[in-house]
């Protein structure tokens, strides 16, 4: 764990009790688990995501999540990336094809501890765990989207 990630989460101002409590959980986990950026930590790990607004800010980009069978904002595993904003932008590009993205805020937009049920992925069982999710607010300068089937 880098000091930068810890400080970014520590300086985040929660907007509600859920974010306040999730922030405390994340800070404690980061302090106790140096491998928090890696999905190899099977109890919990950091993920990065983004709410993405259209160029005119009248629409939001959502993706269909096959595991949960529901719509969600774009995001995924940090996979060791210490810059969570960069990880979120990478995930948005991978999932939507949008490349021209820019942050609309000076830091984290929201925090969430998300429970993940055990499931099969690419023929391998993934045990139940928690995603310590950091969300950013982005605007896309692109109009076209592409589908990522998985």
Walk through the language-model features, giving the residues of each.
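Glycine-rich, flexible loop/turn motifs
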Residues: 33, 42, 67-69, 74, ...
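N-terminal domain-onset segments
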Residues: 1-17, 21
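Phosphate-binding glycine-rich loops and adjacent basic patches that engage nucleotide phosphates
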Residues: 10-13, 47-58, 132-144
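Unchanged
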Residues: 79-150
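Acidic, metal-coordinating catalytic segment for phosphate/diphosphate chemistry
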Residues: 14-49
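Short charge-dense sequence patches
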Residues: 1-3, 35-45, 86, 122-132
